[in-house]
Design a protein with these regions (language model features):
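Short beta-strand/turn micro-motifs at beta-sheet edges
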Residues: 2-6
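Surface-exposed, low-hydrophobicity interaction/linker segments
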Residues: 7, 12, 18-59
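A common structural junction motif
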Residues: 40, 86-95
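The conserved glycine-aromatic submotif of the RRM
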Residues: 63-69
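Helix N-cap motif at beta-to-alpha junctions
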Residues: 71-77
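Hydrophobic side chains in well-ordered alpha-helices
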Residues: 80-83
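Conserved beta-strand -> loop -> alpha-helix junction used to position metal-binding or nucleic-acid-contacting
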Residues: 93-108
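C-terminal low-complexity, charged extensions that often adopt amphipathic alpha-helices
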Residues: 104-161
Length: 161
């Protein structure tokens, strides 16, 4: 079978996406892809979801933070951003999703939007609620571990032990 000429091939845009969740959660590529498809289908319907053709091309996730490159048909970037905004949890784990930028190539999306990572996280012992607890700190905010969950806090909410 012959290849299509360049002017007949579908054109793509690549969304650079940043993910954040609790430090002990693990979110896999397949789970993220499935939730993205469901969000697109629920928001855009079957025809709109097929037009956008959302698919995860690159994915990395560790220590509660992750990055993804989502491939979208040209002209469908706004519906794709809206579908990404509808994601609030993946596999039962709450997740924050930010579209860092849109590019015409995977390489440009990675270089321009995903390589500006903040500080790495560190574990510290803190006093929170009159008890010593473990907190995972990123920049000036921390996630304090309670019995079965985390609580988001800033440096003003706890004392370093």
């Amino acid at each position: 079978m012959k290849h299509l000429p360049k002017h007949l091939r579908p054109r793509w845009r690549y969304l650079a996406v940043e993910l954040e969740t609790w430090p002990d959660e693990r979110i896999g590529r397949r789970s993220f892809q499935r939730e993205l498809w469901y969000a697109g289908q629920n928001l855009l319907g079957d025809p709109g979801s097929a037009d956008a053709d959302l698919s995860v091309v690159r994915y990395a996730f560790a220590d509660g933070r992750g990055e993804a490159i989502v491939k979208v048909r040209r002209g469908e970037t706004d519906p794709a951003r809206a579908a990404l905004a509808c994601l609030d949890e993946v596999d039962g784990a709450p997740v924050g999703v930010w579209v860092r930028g849109i590019s015409g190539t995977i390489r440009a999306a990675e270089e321009n939007y995903l390589r500006r990572r903040g500080q790495d996280s560190e574990e510290r012992n803190v006093v929170f609620g009159n008890e010593e607890r473990v907190a995972v700190r990123r920049d000036s905010v921390g996630d304090v571990r309670l019995d079965e969950a985390f609580v988001g806090a800033t440096d003003l909410d706890y004392d370093l032990a």
